[in-house]
């Protein structure tokens, strides 16, 4: 029992030092600016994280836009939910299903190009505070879009606009351009045990 006060004092000293370091970093950080965030990797949670940021942005009263490049054959929970707020979210489902479902490369390219035209409109609009480009990485990975054009459009967006790009296999150039990159890893997934996608979890 006698060492409890000492432990508490040591803990307090550590936390004070940590706070001082964090406070200094915040004070020395540049002004606010629009961020490019890339969520990639084979694990679950990329789109879920993006839509969490969408909800957070809406909570701050921001105007937002969403373009889904691959998903589209079936309505997802996020689409059904965010479409309830048309005055705040422009939600575009432009895909025609996963690539193994369509089995038509030219059709996939046409769908991706149409989706990018919608994306460019959002990326040029300074009133839009957050743009989610869901599964854009997949479209780029399969060569459905011109990578240089995509990167150029992202760089030319309004200075305070945030963009979240999701999908496996993010291109090295996209990672280089991004401000924040998160790679989702797989430790265990229900699908490996033969459990199909569930409403409210994957759908």
Language-model-detected regions and their locations in the chain:
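Short coil/turn connectors at secondary-structure junctions
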Residues: 33-34, 61-62, 127-128, 159-160
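Conserved P-loop
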Residues: 37-124
């Amino acid at each position: 029992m006698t060492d409890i006060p000492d432990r508490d004092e040591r803990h307090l000293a550590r936390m004070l030092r940590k706070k001082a370091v964090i406070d200094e970093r915040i004070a020395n950080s540049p002004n606010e600016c629009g961020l490019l965030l890339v969520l990639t990797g084979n694990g679950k949670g990329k789109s879920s994280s993006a839509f969490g940021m969408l909800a957070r942005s809406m909570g701050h009263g921001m105007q937002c836009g969403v373009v889904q490049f691959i998903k589209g054959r079936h309505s997802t929970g996020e689409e059904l939910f965010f479409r309830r707020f048309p005055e705040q979210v422009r939600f575009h489902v432009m895909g025609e299903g996963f690539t193994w479902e369509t089995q038509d490369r030219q059709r996939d390219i046409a769908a991706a190009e149409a989706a990018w035209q919608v994306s460019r409109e959002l990326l040029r609009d300074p009133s839009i505070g957050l743009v989610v480009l869901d599964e854009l990485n997949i479209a780029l990975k399969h060569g459905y879009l011109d990578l240089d054009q995509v990167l150029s459009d992202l760089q030319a967006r309004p200075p305070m606009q945030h963009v979240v790009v999701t999908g496996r296999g993010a291109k090295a150039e996209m990672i280089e351009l991004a401000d924040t990159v998160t790679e989702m890893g797989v430790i265990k997934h229900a699908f490996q045990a033969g459990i199909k996608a569930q409403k409210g979890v994957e759908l």
